[in-house]
């Protein structure tokens, strides 16, 4: 009986170690891929062959790696292009808002989210992000109004419904 328990323990422990090693290898590969992609895009930018999409991809990678200030620089470079359409501008401003909120620069995040909504008034994600910032700043009335606006554009939005009921219950 002791041999069985010992064998079971060894097998179980080995499986846990293998799972951890597998997870670590995947994370290293993912990080390595992102680093190689950053190098490729930087080289392309340095050679002045980069497009707005390349800057956007680079900024998105920086966000994944939580390098927010570098991502912000790349998005601001994209904004220098005067040929962007409204949807591109809205996406960039929404991303800038996300970057600022991740750095707890809530006032600047609010400005960027409002700019995104200026270009696309029914941009649901920007409205939800803006409502979330209002919640973080304890501006309950503004958050409620923003979630209600989300429901005007998307009446079936479950996140907005849930958040709205939570905030309303907190106020009561």
UniProtKB/Swiss-Prot annotation:
Pfam families noted in UniProt: TPR_12
Predominant place of localization: plastid
InterPro entries, sorted: TPR-like_helical_dom_sf, TPR_rpt
Alphabetized UniProt keyword annotations: Cyanelle, Plastid, Repeat, TPR repeat
Compartments in which it is found: Plastid, Cyanelle
Any single GO CC term annotated in Swiss-Prot or TrEMBL for this entry: cyanelle
Keyword Coiled coil found: no
TPR repeat segments: 52-85, 90-123, 124-157
Similarity section: Belongs to the ycf37 family.
Name this polypeptide is given: Uncharacterized protein ycf37
Organism: Cyanophora paradoxa
